Amino acid sequence: MNMAQHRYTLLTASLLCALPALAQQSPYYLGASLGVTHVSNIYRSTPGQPSNSDNVTTATLLAGLDQRIGRQRLFGDASIRANHYENNRNLRNNGYALNAGVDWQTIERLSGQLSVNSNRSLAQFNPGNGAPEITKKNIEQTDQARASVRYGLVSLLSLEGSLTHRRRDYSASEYNQYDYSQNTVSLGLTWRPSGALSLGVAGRYSDGKYPRFRPVANGFEADDYTRKDIDLTGTWVASGASTLSGRLSFGKRDASQASSRDFSGGTGSISWKWQPTAKLLINSNLMRDSGDETSFLAIGSIGGISSDYSRITTSASVNASYELTGKIVLDAGLNYSDRDLTDRFGINTVKSGDKTTTLSLGGRWAVNRSTTLGCQLNRDKRTGLSTLSTPYSANSYGCYAQLMVR
């Protein structure tokens, strides 16, 4: 998690809290937020380096809708933000996040979704896996477009397919080799024996490219790769308070240049949403996948994304919210990731790894139906010492005020 995400986590938590109440009254909302955060280690430097702490002020405008029109549903959330660094003025930047689409269905058996996601933000510093440790402004632009279709074969069985396009670009020339694009197609069957259980199997094929992987005399040499997976998926609503969902995949990745990042084996994820009491909500997640996939998990969200250049990342997270009173909510989160790193240029067989732990604590106060105040504290620490990853630790704390109208 980078320092930008520390800041935006404050806003994300409050927005997720405010939207359900607004949706009950109106399909539209407008909002604004102002937050100030102190970050102890902006550049994620290793211990012993000069201090690079800063105070960051973030102003955000928000808008969204969730509107049904007959059988169709339009949805969208958008934010525009301005980030003002007090000391590191060269890092001042503007960004945005977008998540929009339409759920559609016909009178007969056809239904599906069209969606677009986009995010523009300051890229994380010192991401590891041999990435350059720069201290200048580096803007990361990520985009995703997805179309899915479902056709009901019989009452319990449906045929489902999807097509997804992704791309990522950086403004800093030092990160040319990390620009990439990927197209993915998936086709499979889903069985729903009851409203509480669904099971699926699908084939998934991805074709991607790092177009500026390595500079050569007449330009750049590209690294093309393919990935083939068989996905087993399932969702079980155990009760009104507990929902489990998971994916188990068996696949293989092959690259034309960076063969050190090739892998063959199992990936997947499992998540558990549990509400043991009316006041407590716990979300847990366990995941193992390639950096190409984990980088896009949060695209379009207010909090931005966290790019991952690893061969394989295994992570576990637990996030909890407790309603202390009708107006006050306490939040806590713990995330742990273990990355398998390799020399992405494939020049040699250098292999390494690192481990990152992130802890967050916060609170929110709903002053009234439209105003929220909140504060949050974060601790971020990475261990691992090699040519591919260096250790660091960083703390951040801040508060915000948010106004939402409908």
Language model feature labels by segment:
Residues M1-P27, R406:
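Cleavable N-terminal export/targeting peptides
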Residues A23-R406:
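Gram-negative and organellar
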